Amino acid sequence: SVLWFAVGYSMVFGQSQKGFIGAMDHALLLDVPEAPRTENKTECDTSNSGVSMVIFEMTFAILAPAMVLITWTTCIKPTGAMLFMTLWPLFVYYPLTHWIRGHGWLSSTIKVIDFAGGLTLFTTTGTAHFLLTIWIKHKFPNCEKLSLVDQYLQEERESRNFILLILGSLLTMVGWFSLNVISFRSSKHGLILLNTHYTACGAGISWLLVVFTYTGQSSCMDIVYGVMAGLAGSSSCSGYVAPWSSMATGCLTGFLSSALHILARNQMSRCIRENCPDITFMFGIPAIFGSIAAGLFSNTPATENANEVKG
């Protein structure tokens, strides 16, 4: 939060410097209006959107480094975690977010579409988590065996309350509705809610079917994993596609993510977190495919206005 206040917001949404990084004109949140200056309901120009959008975008900036470290917290010293959560946003998250959501070179040159953080949040965290997993498992091969997280999951696996698990996933879906709706200031709120829901449902069903086909058995956890993957995929495209294509996107997202997850477990064990849901395959892969689906299935008006949506 302090880093975002000091330089983060300005690096992302400040005046673009040749498309690569924002200027420091909004450092310490200077010259940020208290209320939006634009009356255009279809445009969310973050440099003029007021402190409410500063807070909203800050949630992305806080979540990003935390998601990278979330499954390896017991294997990293507090000093190392603090160093990572300072340097990674400065050199990875802030520049990349400016390129896509801050009028940078990716949004202005090749018209990259990112609806609600599919590329800037979930793709970057999934990729970073993948690389971090490879490094930790190479450097500390016994880390998972000594991890308190893994010991706890092993002890609680049989006694887990699946009713609470399903309720928790439903609450997460409700929160995701707000995330996607706020990211697009227009009258398409109903369509966004519908697309988010259908993408999650399609991914949950397809993830479950893939696991059942491969292992001959399934559990409620497989549905939850699929729903989370679908929600991540919806963050890339739910404002640009029709309901039928959101369902298709969800089914394909769940299928690809689950299949790649199984393949990685069997063939690339050094690249995957064994006993925890892997961020790469639950959020990273779905977000990448969701971004591709946004380009494949989006209608013309949404694509034309895609670069005006910066919230």
Question: Predicted regions span which residues?
Answer:
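Hydrophobic alpha-helical transmembrane bundles of multi-pass membrane proteins
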Residues: 1-311
